[in-house]
UniProtKB/Swiss-Prot annotation:
<comment type="function">
    <text>Catalyzes the reversible formation of acyl-phosphate (acyl-PO(4)) from acyl-[acyl-carrier-protein] (acyl-ACP). This enzyme utilizes acyl-ACP as fatty acyl donor, but not acyl-CoA.</text>
</comment>
<dbReference type="GO" id="GO:0006633">
    <property type="term" value="P:fatty acid biosynthetic process"/>
</dbReference>
<dbReference type="InterPro" id="IPR003664">
    <property type="entry name" value="FA_synthesis"/>
</dbReference>
<comment type="pathway">
    <text>Lipid metabolism; phospholipid metabolism.</text>
</comment>
<keyword id="KW-0963">Cytoplasm</keyword>
<protein>
    <recommendedName>
        <fullName>Phosphate acyltransferase</fullName>
        <ecNumber>2.3.1.274</ecNumber>
    </recommendedName>
</protein>
<dbReference type="Pfam" id="PF02504">
    <property type="entry name" value="FA_synthesis"/>
</dbReference>
<keyword id="KW-0443">Lipid metabolism</keyword>
<dbReference type="GO" id="GO:0008654">
    <property type="term" value="P:phospholipid biosynthetic process"/>
</dbReference>
<keyword id="KW-0594">Phospholipid biosynthesis</keyword>
<dbReference type="GO" id="GO:0043811">
    <property type="term" value="F:phosphate:acyl-[acyl carrier protein] acyltransferase activity"/>
</dbReference>
<keyword id="KW-1208">Phospholipid metabolism</keyword>
<keyword id="KW-0808">Transferase</keyword>
<comment type="similarity">
    <text>Belongs to the PlsX family.</text>
</comment>
<comment type="subunit">
    <text>Homodimer. Probably interacts with PlsY.</text>
</comment>
<dbReference type="InterPro" id="IPR012281">
    <property type="entry name" value="Phospholipid_synth_PlsX-like"/>
</dbReference>
<keyword id="KW-0444">Lipid biosynthesis</keyword>
Length: 336
């Protein structure tokens, strides 16, 4: 099996490189063909790696970068003022063909700005979009955009729909059902951008557009791809994560209330743990930047070891499915 090589921005995220290094070592154990390049401060990274003496150093290398982009740093400042940041160096490794994907838990705005500057977008795409898998009653739905583009035109929403459809196909969904997130399913509902995007999608050949969808329809699994602007998508994603955590916490509290509830809880514990694992945000961590000339996956800044592993796993799937090339081919067919 040929090697799968990924660059890791080891200095990004809320918790620093320790949990990232742990996630990388766990990913190497799970995937024998995986090779990782950690980008960041060599002395710090080598010290962290040394605490895992069993790791195969032939598959885990370190590339030096002297600067780190802060989580609250403005994208423009990061783009102009930090040419040797771990994030930028990781993206340049991807641009130069030394790795096949880049994963970062760093500043989202800076990652998007640097990705567009270093990698460029695919022909026909104005703006990349962030997409992630959301659990539904019937499986998963690809939701985009998740915050990269707060204000979107109808044309941008149309491009997101095309990219989301291709991504879903790459993940094994035949003729993905594509829907626009809206405040109602009737044609008269929604703002002007959503209505115009619907008109564009209705006329798109080769795209399985099923109309508008409301938030509850998303969770019922009524579409495989749901499209919205980044303002709405980011709120929906974080609300979903918060709701899942709240439900799990409330159920655990109910099972601890008295002796009877504790007995019932003990019987239900295996099922509850399975449900919690299914809905846990860490399991679904990893948002892809679609529309770039390269694979970039954004991990949640607060992701721990398991969450960062999930982001690496998403990058692996996209490498194996040759996603940017597939996108490029389908975009030529679908975009006007």
């Amino acid at each position: 099996m040929s090697a799968l090589v990924i660059a890791i921005d080891a200095m990004g995220g809320d918790f620093g490189p320790r949990s990232i290094v742990q996630a990388c070592i766990a990913s190497l154990s799970a995937t024998p063909s995986l090779h990782l390049t950690l980008v960041g401060q060599p002395s710090l990274l080598e010290e962290l790696i040394a605490s895992h003496p069993a790791v195969d150093r032939a598959r885990l290398t370190v590339t030096a970068a002297s600067e780190t982009i802060g989580m609250d740093e403005k994208p423009a400042a990061a783009l102009r003022g930090k040419p040797d940041s771990s994030m930028r160096v990781a993206l340049e490794l991807l641009r130069d063909g030394k790795v096949q994907a880049c994963v970062s838990a760093g500043n989202t705005g800076a990652l998007m700005a640097l990705s567009r500057y270093v990698l460029k977008t695919l022909p026909g795409i104005d703006r990349p979009a962030m997409v992630a898998a959301i659990p539904t009653q019937k499986g998963y739905c690809q939701l985009l955009d998740l915050g990269a583009n707060v204000d979107c035109s109808a044309e941008h929403l149309f491009q997101f729909a095309v990219m989301g459809s291709v991504a879903a196909e790459a993940l094994g969904v035949a003729r993905p059902r594509v829907a626009l997130l809206n405040i109602g399913t009737e044609d008269i509902k929604g703002n002007q951008q959503v209505k115009l995007a619907a008109t564009l999608l209705q006329g798109a050949r080769g795209l399985n557009y099923v109309g508008f969808i409301e938030g509850d329809g998303l969770y019922r699994g009524e579409a495989d791809v749901v499209v919205c602007d980044g303002f709405v998508g980011n709120i929906l994603l974080k609300s979903s994560e918060g709701l899942a955590t709240m439900i799990a916490t409330r159920i655990e509290a109910l099972f601890r209330q008295n002796l009877v509830s504790r007995m019932v809880g003990a019987l239900a514990l295996p099922l509850m743990r399975r449900l919690q694992a299914d809905l846990a945000p860490a399991r679904h961590n990893g948002a892809s930047f679609l529309g770039l000339q390269g694979i970039v996956v954004k991990s949640h800044g607060s992701a721990g070891v398991e969450g960062f592993q999930s982001a690496i796993a998403r990058a692996l799937i996209e490498i194996q499915e040759n996603l940017p090339q597939r996108l490029h081919g389908r975009l030529e067919d679908l975009l006007p």
